[in-house]
Amino acid sequence: MECVRSGSGVLDPRCSPRFLGKKGGSLTSCGKATSTNLAICTKHEQNLHGNVKPSQLAASGSSYSVHRSPVLKQRQNLSARSTSADVYTTFDENVRAVSSHAAEEKVGVLLLNLGGPETLDDVQPFLFNLFADPDIIRLPRLFRFLQRPLAKLISTFRAPKSKEGYASIGGGSPLRKITDEQANALKVALKKKNLNANIYVGMRYWYPFTEEAIDQIKKDKITKLVVLPLYPQYSISTSGSSIRVLQNIVKEDSYFAGLPISIIESWYQRDGYVKSMADLIEKELSIFSNPEEVMIFFSAHGVPLTYVTDAGDPYRDQMEDCIALIMGELKSRGILNSHTLAYQSRVGPVQWLKPYTDEVLVELGQQGVKSLLAVPVSFVSEHIETLEEIDMEYKELALESGIENWGRVPALGCTSSFISDLADAVVEALPSASALVTKKVDESDSDMDLMHYLSKMFFGSILAFVLLLSPRLISAFRNTLL
């Protein structure tokens, strides 16, 4: 199914890294979907990082557990069965392989994504898993014992507002459904390229967790694996976090230690992706009465500025490169519209990548811009940040600021050209798959002076994420004192 937006701007309801740390090894760029060897260069304790199942905890002795809602505890078995039926199905064994050697291999493709709450009851535990990730709240090693208490505090106070957002888009995130559709579409596209493959979906913060997909990969006895994060650009907090889960597994699992693996780190530079984005933009521009007067407004998910300045996250550079490639493709088609890039979804008082989407929208209105086409460039699936944040909050702000004509490019979803390009990326990555290289990590967190690092990261993080709860937290304290 191809997920497109109708001329009226209504979304079809069916469509409802380079850097791994400053020290040690790193992932080299994949370029156009080549593979890499992964050098493990950060070490996170499992009880702070992975979303593991109770059976795994019992075996390992770990004290970490995933916060699950009662509803999900009851449906866990059903969840696993439905995922297996929808995604893990292999191709017909009679389909001709590219070569006799390939026919003997059992290829798997692991799609990595964020995950999202499927019901309102899922929202708080989903947020807990999100904020319990040390790549989201980056605390110094000495203070990581605060990770889970902070995650509990933040998720508890943020859940009511987040529930309002999810309620406004139907009561849950469509991300899992769309990702499963993309997995099935990729399976078909690979079959057309004479590649039989099992497709797996691993979500970072909700079902099906990456660990569940890993378990299934082992049961299926996959002999070669391609890891494909569904994030066009690499960031520590997205692809990086998901890949680190895989790192921890490799360190402890003899099966994966010897499994040839290819990791496609980022793929925003691929011609197929760039052209698919340009196709969607061109189509939406044609809906406006005066397409040449429309400003193209790229809105990307933001990250704290320190990720880039202190941790070396390549996200900003890759995002700017991505925009340049898309605009270059549009220019080759004679589309010369002006454009701008801004970053959305910031939280707390700390500085994030600028300019901020909400501030830019107000400025554009003040400058007299009348027609705007929003392009969610970080996302390949519709979810709360497109359906609620962009379609509702930012649209309302834009209209209030004087922008008269608003449009939004849909996420790529299951667009055939996009899925075909992902299939090409997988095929290109297979030949150089090799066992991941593990490396013992220096226990130090960075090269910064210890006191400087502790004061900057610890107190900054605590202050930022406590203030993040305002005004609800302040109000609660005030009521207690009174």
UniProtKB/Swiss-Prot annotation:
The keyword Chloroplast applies. InterPro entries: Ferrochelatase, Ferrochelatase_AS, Ferrochelatase_C, Ferrochelatase_N. One of its GO terms (molecular function) is ferrochelatase activity. The keyword Iron applies. It is an enzyme of class 4 (lyase). It is found in: Plastid, Chloroplast. Catalyzes the ferrous insertion into protoporphyrin IX. This is Ferrochelatase-1, chloroplastic. It comes from Oryza sativa subsp. japonica (Rice).
